[in-house]
Amino acid sequence: MIKIENKFFFILAFSMALVVAISNYLVQFPVNYFALQDLLTYGAFSYPVAFLITDLSNRRYGKNTAKKIVYLGFTLGVFLTFYFSTNYSDLISIRIAIGSGTAFLTAQLIDVNIFDKLRNKIWFTAPLVSSLIGSTIDTFLFFSISFYGTGINWVTLSFGDLFVKIFVALTMLIPFRLLLSHIQENSTIKEKISV
C-alpha cells in the first residue's frame, strides 16, 4: 500500500509541476477575443488547477505531506519552465520564471495552512477560502514581479487574471467534491510518505 501511496504522491507533484510549466508558458499570451487582450492571459485558466491539486493533497495526506508536494511540484515546475519556455536573452521570460516561483511557493504554502485550519468545516469551505486567498496572493505577486516597470499593463492583467481564477476556483469545487469521496475511501492507512 505504501508503494501505491508513493506513486500517488509523485503523480500529484508531477501534475502540479505540469500545471505550473503550462501556466508559465500560457501567461505570455493575451486572450485576443472580445477585446480581452489587455485584461487576460491564457495562464489564468490553467493555473488554478494547482490549488485543486494542493487541496486534494492536503485532504488526503495532511498539511506536512501537502507541503512536500508543493515543494516538489515547485522544483519540477521551475525546471520545466526554464527548460521549455524561458528565452534566456529575454529579461521578461526570466522575470516570469522568478515571479512564478516566488508567487507559487508563497501562495501554495499559504493555501496549505489555511486549508488545514478550515479542514473540519463544511466540505467546500477549506478548498474555496484557501484557493481564493492563495489565488489573490499569487496573482499580485506574480504580475508585479514579472511585469512591473516593463510597460506591460500588469495591474489590468492581474485583475482580469484574478477574476478568472475566482471563477475557476468555484468550478474546481465540482471535481474536488467528486474526488473527495474517492480519496477518503482509499485513504484507510494513516502512514506518512517519507520523501
Predicted stretch roles:
Residues 9-13, 64-75, 122-129:
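Cytoplasmic-side transmembrane-helix entry/capping segments in multi-pass membrane proteins
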Residues 94-192:
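Membrane-embedded alpha-helical hairpins and interfacial helices in multi-pass inner-membrane proteins
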Residues 28-37, 87-92, 150-157:
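Membrane-interface helix termini and inter-helical loops of multi-pass transporters
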Residues 20-28, 80-88, 142, 146, ...:
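Structural signal for membrane-spanning alpha-helices in multi-pass inner-membrane proteins
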Residues 76-104:
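Helix-adjacent hinge/juxtasegments
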